[in-house]
């Protein structure tokens, strides 16, 4: 083993490496639990410092630094300094010797047949002609790359250049780091890169800032727009603007950092949303009174796919011991032959649906992590062999392909979410919840989540559109030199849009699930109030006859209570004594059936059940509405007779997060607050 001139371990042959093609390392990266991996990402995101060494940058660290209000500081490894210096000196020395190198003594791309000895001037011209982006005017022009994406790109480009194969001074990397740490962000154009010879156009604006180009602008820590001089002053960069030496301009712009930087932040969110979708599916099972059998480990073991197995295991863990599942089991045992044997696909096949999407997102994450730790410019400076190697690592195909695949996975997750909320708001499918999850007293003046479902349809449609690939829209560029190109940043931008839409859907669905949880709580208390009232009225009216003797109708009480168990509360609770609703119809039916079997006793006023029906119904009308209202008020006041079952479930932390930490409230038509206000709280929170 020996250390080469770039400061890295060198090997005379790839074949001496046990994993020369890197397949083993790639496979090893995908072992273990995705959930554990996401937990690690979140821990890394929360770290206060990111130390760059060139080889071990994580997407979570990129996401942390990218945050516009980030307080994360970036440090450069001093150990990398010698390698960076060696490649920079090699370029200067080779030019002094008259060595002909691409981008050092030649023109660029299709015009590389041109030659010059003015190395510094050539780099300045490179930056000038690449400053071809359009920003427009006004804050709403929408043609500026988000500051978070620019910060991600700056971090990733530093990491690449630290590896010492690019021929750039360490001081320039320190200057970019100073801008990051001072929260000074150069303005880059949103569009104009095909991520083929890297992200040439947007990265040229970072180079323009470093060289003090008069058109360079940045956003300062307070959000104001500043020029390059003010940016350098705020960042505390000494010695003024840089005079680019040979190769340095090319080193700055000829890389995939913008596409891979944005892809990193996108995938950080996508991984978390993927885990959240697994948890949400389990909560969906709880509020829908589903059958947890769909998570049985044998089913998924026999299918073999790791994403599916893990998704099912997460759902099984959440549902194990769930109070909702215990209650649902009892309900399924009532008249089992009259109920569906299985739940619909949106619940029953959710592990099979989500598993492959998680595998795709995980694979894309590893691909992008390899990219942000790669050397991706051209030419590469190999000091150990005293040569510049001309290749094409700037081609951002891993970004374009990974982002296209991720976007398709995100769209599939969103589609499942839409299918689930469509069941949840539909009283034909939701096992007794009110239509539109209306929580108010009068369903004629409360349409609950109707607007939310319409919005979800819009989100889902746009998400499905975005699922279409970007990478099959390649145009030959740069005089047919860049005749195939990755479109990496374009695909990353579209995936960022898709993630944003999935966040909208997730926020809406989380509030809907919490609404359903609280409606189940209300349902239980209503049912208990109805049972108690019917039982008490039965005892008063049906137990004895006119003469005080025991009456045959006393045997009806048990059957009357069974009616309440079988009837969905929200089908009648807004007017429980209405004959248009099923409760009174079914209660009367019980009494009529007993009367019909009462035989000769019906002829006697003292023993006639028919003659008891009117008295029973009148007393019920007098008592039941009051008891139902009292039950509602007690739930609203937090003094309900029956506690909310969610507190006995493993999904409770998610409910508590939405209700208590974020403050999203139970929605009713009686309140002024709109659903969107509550969705917004969750959207900002996640």
UniProtKB/Swiss-Prot annotation:
Enzyme class, UniProt record, top EC level: lyase
Catalytic activity entry: L-phenylalanine = (E)-cinnamate + NH4(+)
Gene Ontology cellular-component terms listed: cytoplasm
Principal location: cytoplasm
GO molecular function list: phenylalanine ammonia-lyase activity
CDD domains for this protein: PAL-HAL
Residues bearing PTM 2,3-didehydroalanine (Ser): 197
Active site, UniProt feature: 102 (proton donor/acceptor)
Binding residue positions for (E)-cinnamate: 254, 342, 348, 378, 450, 478, 481
InterPro entries the record matches: Aromatic_Lyase (IPR001106), Fumarase/histidase_N (IPR024083), L-Aspartase-like (IPR008948), Phe/His_NH3-lyase_AS (IPR022313), Phe_NH3-lyase (IPR005922), Phe_NH3-lyase_shielding_dom_sf (IPR023144)
Example GO biological process: cinnamic acid biosynthetic process
Tissue and organ distribution: Mostly expressed in stems and bulbs, and, to a lower extent, in roots, leaves and flowers.
Subunit-level organization: Homotetramer.
Identification of the protein by name: Phenylalanine ammonia-lyase 2
Gene: PAL2
């Amino acid at each position: 083993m020996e250390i080469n001139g770039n400061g890295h371990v060198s090997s005379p042959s790839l074949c001496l490496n046990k994993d020369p093609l890197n397949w083993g390392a790639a496979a090893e990266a995908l072992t273990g639990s995705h959930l554990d991996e996401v937990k690690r990402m979140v821990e890394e995101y929360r770290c206060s410092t990111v130390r760059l060494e060139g080889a071990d940058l994580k997407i979570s660290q990129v996401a942390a630094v990218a945050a516009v209000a980030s307080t994360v500081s970036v440090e450069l490894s001093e150990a990398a300094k010698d390698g960076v210096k060696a490649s920079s000196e090699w370029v200067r020395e080779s030019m002094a010797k008259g060595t002909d190198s691409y981008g050092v003594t030649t023109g660029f791309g299709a015009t590389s047949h041109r030659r010059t000895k003015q190395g510094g001037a050539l780099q300045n011209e490179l930056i000038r002609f690449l400053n071809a982006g359009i920003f427009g005017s006004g804050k709403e022009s929408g043609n500026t790359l988000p500051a978070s994406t620019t910060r991600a790109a700056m971090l990733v480009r530093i990491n690449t250049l630290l590896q010492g194969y690019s021929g750039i001074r360490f001081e320039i990397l320190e200057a970019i780091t100073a801008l990051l740490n001072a929260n000074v962000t150069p303005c880059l154009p949103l569009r104009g890169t095909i991520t083929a010879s890297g992200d040439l156009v947007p990265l040229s604006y970072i180079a323009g800032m470093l060289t003090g180009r008069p058109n360079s602008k940045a956003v300062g820590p307070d959000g104001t727009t500043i020029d390059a001089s003010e940016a350098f002053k705020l960042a505390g960069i000494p010695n003024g603007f840089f005079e680019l030496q040979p190769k340095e301009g090319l080193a700055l712009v000829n890389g995939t950092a913008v596409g891979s930087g944005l892809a990193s932040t996108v995938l950080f969110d996508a991984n978390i949303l993927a885990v959240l979708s697994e948890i949400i599916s389990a909560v969906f099972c709880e509020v829908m009174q589903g059958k947890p059998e769909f998570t049985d480990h044998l089913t998924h073991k026999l299918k073999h796919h790791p994403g599916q197995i893990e998704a099912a295991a997460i759902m099984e863990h959440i549902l194990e011991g769930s109070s909702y599942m215990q209650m649902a089991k009892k309900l399924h045992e009532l008249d089992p032959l009259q109920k569906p044997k299985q739940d619909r696909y949106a619940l029953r096949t959710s592990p099979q649906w989500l598993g492959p999407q998680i595998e795709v997102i995980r694979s894309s994450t590893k691909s992008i992590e390899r990219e942000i730790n790669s050397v991706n410019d051209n030419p590469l400076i190999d000091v150990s062999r005293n040569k510049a190697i001309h290749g094409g690592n700037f081609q951002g195909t891993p970004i374009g392909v990974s982002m296209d695949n991720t976007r398709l996975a995100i769209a599939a997750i969103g589609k499942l979410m839409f299918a689930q909320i469509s069941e949840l708001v539909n009283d034909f499918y939701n096992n007794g919840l009110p239509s539109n999850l209306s929580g108010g007293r009068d369903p004629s003046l409360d349409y609950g989540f109707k607007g939310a479902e319409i919005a979800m349809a819009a989100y889902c449609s746009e998400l499905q559109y975005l699922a279409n690939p970007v990478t099959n829209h390649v145009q030959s560029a740069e005089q047919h030199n860049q005749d195939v190109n990755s479109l990496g940043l374009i695909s990353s931008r579209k995936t960022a849009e898709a993630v944003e839409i999935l966040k909208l859907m997730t926020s809406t669905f989380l509030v809907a699930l919490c609404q359903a949880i609280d409606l189940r709580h209300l349902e239980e208390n209503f049912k208990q109030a109805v049972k108690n009232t019917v039982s008490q009225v039965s005892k008063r009216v049906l137990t004895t006859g006119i003469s005080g003797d025991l009456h045959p109708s006393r045997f009806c009480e048990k059957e009357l209570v069974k009616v309440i168990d079988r009837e969905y509360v929200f089908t009648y609770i807004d007017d429980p004594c209405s004959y248009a609703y099923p409760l009174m119809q079914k209660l009367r039916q019980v009494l009529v059936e007993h009367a019909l079997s009462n035989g000769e006793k019906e002829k006697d006023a003292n023993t006639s059940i028919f003659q008891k029906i009117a008295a029973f119904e009148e007393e019920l009308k007098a008592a039941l509405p009051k008891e139902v209202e009292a039950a509602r008020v007690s739930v609203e006041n937090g003094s309900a007779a029956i506690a909310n079952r969610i507190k006995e479930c493993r999904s409770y932390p998610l409910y508590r997060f939405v209700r208590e930490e974020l403050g999203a409230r139970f929605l009713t038509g009686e309140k002024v607050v709109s659903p969107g206000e509550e969705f917004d709280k969750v959207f900002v929170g996640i």
